[in-house]
Amino acid sequence: MNDKDTFRMHTKVIQIGDRKIGGGNPIAIQSMTNTKTEDVKATVEQILRLERAGCEIIRCTVPTLEAAAAIREIKKQIHIPLVADIHFDYRMALAAIENGADKIRINPGNIGNPERVKAVVDAAKERNIPIRVGVNSGSLEKPLVEKYGGVTAEGIVESALDKVHMIEDLGYDNLVISIKSSDVLMCVKAHELLAGRTVYPLHVGITESGTVNSGNIKSAIGLSLILSQGIGDTIRVSLTGDPVEEIKSAKLILRTLGLRKGGIEVVSCPTCGRTQINLIDLATKVEKMVEDYPLDIKVAVMGCVVNGPAEAKEADLGVAGGIGEGLLIKHGEIVKKLPEDQLLPALKEELDHWS
């Protein structure tokens, strides 16, 4: 599958800093810092690491006026749009906007009375920065829980649209919507319902998905079910761990679905009793080695000479192990036989001179 084959629902184009989302623009990968935003040095260092990994939009929490003030200095040192995450106190939103946030994320239902919501909307309107309207299943309003007999996809969607209409009634439509749940199937259903009822870009993610292991599985399932229907304009893989891992996972999900090109795909056999080299170690090292290559190719790491050579030939580049040695295979042809300890350097040399 390639980009031309991949169906995308049409949504409104929204500008976030220098990045456009919606309207068929590439799906943007987001993450969120886990530093104290007031700590400018630590926050900038983490954002720069995320940039190098492929993060395209970053969100920072703004719980204090000091955090809001830090946005101005942080933005001087980073290269991607910054979203201010606001909860409860509308003054944090006003301060974040004043200090140059490229977008703000709010739940209009938890930042106070209508006058406070209007103050935030007016400030965003003055600078023409988007507002992301965020609703999570865990904070669904009691009347909607009672109306639908519990927390449901229908309730989540109604809550989100109520908030959107609140802002539209104030004369502003520079909006992005996010609806999240840790329940994968509920989250999928909610996105299906919402996508048919709005033209605003959707930020997609499975919230509180868990650690790197469990969170990756839940996010891959949920995001794939949503994205494969053409729904979604930005994504985040929410993990309990280093945010850089979120970017790696998001890139792999998009590439697997044919929604993004670039980056080397590593395939390897699951090992069996025929494996004749230390394949687990080799495959792990290959996967780490290729992270920063922009090449759009497939590399195979196979463990034995029974099926290895034939399977490696389906890749652009590969190795197939023997007893303490292995074959280097390129474009389906065996290039050379090498000792096991030379396979990784040989792969790297081929990648460095790839054409």
What are the residue ranges of the model-derived segments?
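Catalytic alpha/beta core domains of metabolic enzymes, predominantly
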Residues: 136, 144-291
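Active-site mouth loops of central-metabolism enzymes
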Residues: 24-42, 61, 80-88, 144-157, ...
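Glycine-rich, proline-tolerant flexible connector loops at the mouths of alpha/beta enzymes
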Residues: 34, 39-40, 51-74, 105-113, ...
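N-terminal amphipathic alpha-helix/helix-capping segment at the start of soluble metabolic enzymes
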Residues: 1-32, 125, 288
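Alpha-helix-loop-beta-strand connector modules within alpha/beta enzyme cores
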Residues: 65-86, 119-131, 191-202, 286-288
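Glycine-enriched alpha-helix->loop->beta-strand junction motifs that scaffold or abut catalytic
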Residues: 78-80, 98-104, 125-128, 195-201, ...
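Hydrophobic faces of well-ordered beta-strands that scaffold small-molecule active sites
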Residues: 27-33, 58-60, 82-86, 104-106, ...
